């Protein structure tokens, strides 16, 4: 299975940590966020890494070059940050099979393998790692509605009145069918091409998307305090493992 990592963002909210580097190169527990992402994807069996870069992309390219732990890396350039569906289309020519998608500003310690296993065994059209959050936080995320079979029936991007508190976490598996859906996406009220709309198009066309509930934790590294929390969690787990 191939893997895509989205790492084009400026990380404005992470300043001053991103004044001289892209968000993915901010260190957490002694190594860049992207290294955490790459390690997990390689451990999950990624045979190819496709990294979407943008802001200060040369720093990422110089650091990782063309391979990581023996897995080849290809870079795709997103010249303008116009949403996740827009970013995903930059890799269309590099992906020809089912693939993992990870947002390159998240730290995971969770059951990512369950998502990959579901994709491989059930031949679902997609599978997402999802988690429940406090209701007053749900409007910050892509919110999922599921049926009794654990299939996602609707995704709404940052709704003012969330119909659910189940949200996407930033780890997905897809078939290449997602690219056609991304081509059909129209700009949202925010002026972005939202991946949630592409997902909704897949659902309305009869595709099956499975929701895998998180077992563990993940943190979106949006602010300096998020970086600090992720670092503390990782260090605590390292300490516990050595006791």
Swiss-Prot record:
Q: What class of enzyme is it?
A: transferase
The entry summarizes the disruption phenotype as follows: Mutants exhibit defective or limited motility.
**Can you tell me where the transmembrane regions are?**
none
Q: Which reaction is the catalytic activity of this chain?
A: alpha-D-glucose 1-phosphate + UTP + H(+) = UDP-alpha-D-glucose + diphosphate
Any Gene Ontology biological process: S-layer organization
NCBIfam families referenced in this protein's UniProt entry, alphabetically: UDPGP_AglF_Halo
* Superkingdom of origin organism: Archaea
Q: Which family does it belong to?
A: Belongs to the UDPGP type 2 family.
EC number from the UniProt entry: 2.7.7.9
Q: Does the keyword Nucleotidyltransferase apply?
A: yes
What keywords sit in the KW lines?
Nucleotidyltransferase, Transferase
Q: Name one Pfam family in it.
A: NTP_transferase
Could you tell me which InterPro entries the record lists for this protein?
AglF-like, GlmU-like, NTP_transferase_dom, Nucleotide-diphossugar_trans
Stated role: Involved in the assembly of a N-linked pentasaccharide that decorates the S-layer glycoprotein and flagellins. Involved in the biosynthesis of the hexuronic acid found at position 3 of the pentasaccharide.
- Protein's pathway: Cell surface structure biogenesis; S-layer biogenesis
Q: What is the designated name of this protein?
A: UTP--glucose-1-phosphate uridylyltransferase AglF
Classification via PANTHER family: N-ACETYLMURAMATE ALPHA-1-PHOSPHATE URIDYLYLTRANSFERASE (PTHR43584:SF8), NUCLEOTIDYL TRANSFERASE (PTHR43584)
Single GO molecular-function term? UTP:glucose-1-phosphate uridylyltransferase activity
């Amino acid at each position: 299975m191939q893997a895509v990592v989205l790492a084009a963002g400026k990380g404005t909210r992470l300043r001053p940590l991103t004044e001289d580097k892209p968000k993915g190169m901010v260190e957490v527990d002694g190594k860049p966020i992207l290294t955490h992402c790459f390690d997990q994807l390689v451990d999950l069996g990624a045979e190819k890494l496709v990294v979407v870069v943008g802001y200060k992309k040369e720093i990422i390219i110089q650091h990782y070059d063309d391979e990581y732990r023996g897995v080849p890396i290809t870079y795709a350039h997103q010249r303008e940050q116009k949403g996740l569906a827009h970013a995903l289309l930059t890799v269309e020519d590099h992906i020809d099979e089912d693939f993992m998608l990870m947002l390159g500003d998240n730290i995971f310690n969770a059951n990512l393998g369950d998502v990959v296993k579901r994709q491989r065994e059930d031949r679902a059209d997609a599978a997402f790692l999802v988690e429940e959050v406090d209701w007053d936080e749900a409007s910050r995320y892509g919110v999922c509605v599921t049926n009794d079979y654990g299939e996602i029936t609707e995704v709404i991007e940052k709704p003012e009145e969330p119909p659910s508190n189940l949200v996407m976490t930033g780890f997905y598996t897809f078939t290449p069918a997602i690219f056609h859906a991304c081509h059909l996406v129209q700009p949202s009220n925010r002026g972005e091409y939202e991946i949630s709309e592409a997902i909704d198009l897949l659902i309305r066309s009869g595709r099956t998307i499975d929701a895998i509930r998180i077992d563990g934790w993940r943190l979106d590294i949006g602010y300096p305090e998020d970086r600090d929390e992720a670092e503390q969690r990782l260090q605590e787990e390292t300490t516990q493992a050595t006791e």
